[in-house]
């Protein structure tokens, strides 16, 4: 998606290394979503695998309120994206984010791969403990 958004047309990419976010590790964009994305998305970013465990753990441990959210590896990028965006002045300006903004984060899966989820949760919990 990132490459296609950047060049403004469907673009296939060769995947050099698979991501732990298996559902997002695709070489091309599906045609139906592309019809929507090409005319409505102005900004796009890529999330590294290393950032996933901490977000999975923060969501699971209720760091953002009273709710505990079981968010798998393809849901955590929503949290990472808003965190990165709010901590970068240029991105905040580009997205017109401020204290009055309302942001909807969509998580597209829970713990669909329980072994991977537990591994990410354990690693992320360790990161939280180590500060």
Where is each model-derived feature located?
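Active-site-adjacent helical/loop segments in soluble small-molecule enzymes
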Residues: 30-96
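Glycine-rich phosphate/pyrophosphate-binding loop at beta-loop-alpha junctions
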Residues: 1-39, 92-126
């Amino acid at each position: 998606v990132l490459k296609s958004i950047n060049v403004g047309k469907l673009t296939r990419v060769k995947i050099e290394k698979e991501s732990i976010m298996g559902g997002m590790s695709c070489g091309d964009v599906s045609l139906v979503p592309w019809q929507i994305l090409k005319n409505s998305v102005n900004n796009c970013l890529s999330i590294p695998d290393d950032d996933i465990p901490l977000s999975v753990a923060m969501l699971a441990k209720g760091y953002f309120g009273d709710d505990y959210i079981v968010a798998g590896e393809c849901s955590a990028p929503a949290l990472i994206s808003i965190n990165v965006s709010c901590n970068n002045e240029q991105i905040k300006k580009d997205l017109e984010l401020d204290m009055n903004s309302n942001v909807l984060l969509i998580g597209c899966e829970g713990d669909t791969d329980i072994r991977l989820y537990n591994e990410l949760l354990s690693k992320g919990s360790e990161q939280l403990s180590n500060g």
